[in-house]
Amino acid sequence: MSEIKLIVGLGNPGEKYADTRHNAGEWLIERLARRFNVSLNPESKFFGKTVRTLVNGKEVRLLVPTTFMNLSGKAVGALASFYRIKPEEILVIHDELDLPAGTAKLKQGGGHGGHNGLKDIVAQLGNNNNFYRLRIGIGHPGHRDLVAGYVLNKPSPADRNALEKVLDEATDCVEMIFKDGMIKATNRLNSFKI
């Protein structure tokens, strides 16, 4: 099993979107940066904010693209290419409509499920979808016509509370990847219940 060398948190740039459901991936990267006592810095050649850190003695880079969601692959592709990071060494953290708020799942590979950020990352990695995903449940509005408005709005107070709890657990599980391996971290996160 490959070691994770790049952790990417997806979101949209700017204050307008900072607290919206679509930025759940970025929220987790911010927590990881605090946990590892590092600050993300703008890096124009990578189209995002990034930092290098050591987790349990292993070098890893954190990245938040500063492009809009549907261009996330531009940042991921640029950084992965520059540092020769393979798709299977990348963990992408993103919001997931098909999971309820308060849940999260780790997996490798799979489709994009209509998520435009994932779609662009797959394309920019040469149509390789073999990267890991940490999917943060945000719930579903009920009808696909409501999705765009739903992901670009703030979660309800109850959902925000559920998200805070699962983000705490996900932060621990990401750190666990570097200490105990992906399988143990996946089993723990995928069975988490509030």
From Swiss-Prot:
GO terms for cellular component: cytoplasm. It catalyses: an N-acyl-L-alpha-aminoacyl-tRNA + H2O = an N-acyl-L-amino acid + a tRNA + H(+). Gene3D superfamilies: Peptidyl-tRNA hydrolase. It is found in: Cytoplasm. Its EC number is 3.1.1.29. The record marks N12 as: Discriminates between blocked and unblocked aminoacyl-tRNA. TRNA binds at Y17, F68, N70, N116. The active site is at H22. Coiled coil: none annotated. Monomer. Belongs to the PTH family. This is Peptidyl-tRNA hydrolase. It comes from Haemophilus influenzae (strain PittGG). The gene is pth.
